[in-house]
């Protein structure tokens, strides 16, 4: 239970409970408008981050999953307190459970922002084979290129000190309420500087760790607890949403 996936599922459940009789269109939007002042760095595990971005895109529409070439679908989206940022359609795993648990959804997509300098570095990494996940022989031993790359890139945990700007992550939802079409946008903006001042970590780590703590707290209190395996959107969203406002991630 991080932010996405995690909070975005709770956001969707909250919208379904309080603002819609039927959710039809869901766009999860993730913008990091921060600057870590490094030539190239990832905000979490580089191996996972690069593999996530370079895989084929995937979204849900009219009852079926549709694939796209990596980062081939993009458009500018406007983010609160940030402005327009080019946003790229990607596959993100929460779409799988959200379309199952809210079967009225006609289309569900996930968007993430990237700067051109980041994408240029990413293309170079791919073109020279450093994003490969298969072992290669080097000096008589096997190494995995992307794991070697991880070892030489900046540690995501060390980015916080000089990080400026903020993240903006949320759900843009369209559907029906009382027979009328309605839209609803629920989001959080998190300052990298404020996150570092409070915890010594940058905003991406903060927005991942705080929701995990809230989920664990609700589980230990028995608020979110029932037999079986459940996704976050299958629990009552209200206690979680209340905790977000109290624990540093207001919406």
Predicted regions and their residues:
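Rossmann-fold dehydrogenase core element
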Residues: 1-2, 23
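Conserved A3 ("GATE") glycine/threonine-rich loop of ANL adenylate-forming enzymes
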Residues: 3-5, 33
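Active-site-proximal alpha-helical scaffold in enzymes
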Residues: 6-19
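C-terminal catalytic/substrate-binding lobe primarily of soluble NAD(P)-dependent oxidoreductases
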Residues: 17-251
């Amino acid at each position: 239970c991080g932010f996405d996936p995690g909070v975005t599922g709770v956001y969707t459940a909250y919208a379904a409970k309080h603002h819609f009789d039927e959710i039809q269109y869901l766009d999860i939007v993730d913008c990091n408008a921060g600057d870590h002042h490094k030539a190239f760095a990832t905000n979490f595990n580089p191996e996972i981050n690069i593999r996530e971005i370079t895989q084929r895109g995937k979204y849900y529409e009219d009852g079926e999953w549709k694939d796209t070439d990596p980062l081939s679908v993009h458009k500018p989206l406007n983010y609160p307190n940030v402005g327009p940022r080019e946003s790229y359609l990607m596959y993100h795993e929460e779409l799988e459970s959200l379309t199952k648990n809210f079967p009225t959804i006609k289309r569900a997509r996930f968007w993430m922002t990237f700067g051109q300098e980041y994408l240029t570095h990413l293309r170079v990494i791919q073109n020279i084979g450093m994003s490969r996940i298969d072992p290669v022989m080097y000096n008589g031993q096997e190494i995995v290129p992307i794991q070697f790359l991880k070892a030489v890139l900046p540690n995501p945990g060390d980015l916080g000190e000089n990080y400026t700007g903020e993240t903006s992550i949320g759900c843009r939802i369209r559907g029906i309420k009382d027979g009328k079409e309605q839209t609803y946008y629920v989001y959080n903006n998190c300052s990298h500087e404020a996150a570092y001042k409070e915890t010594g970590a940058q905003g991406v780590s903060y927005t991942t760790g705080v929701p995990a703590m809230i989920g664990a707290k609700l589980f230990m209190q028995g608020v979110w607890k029932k037999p079986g395996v459940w996704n976050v959107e299958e629990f009552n969203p209200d206690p979680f949403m209340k905790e977000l406002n109290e624990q540093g991630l207001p919406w």
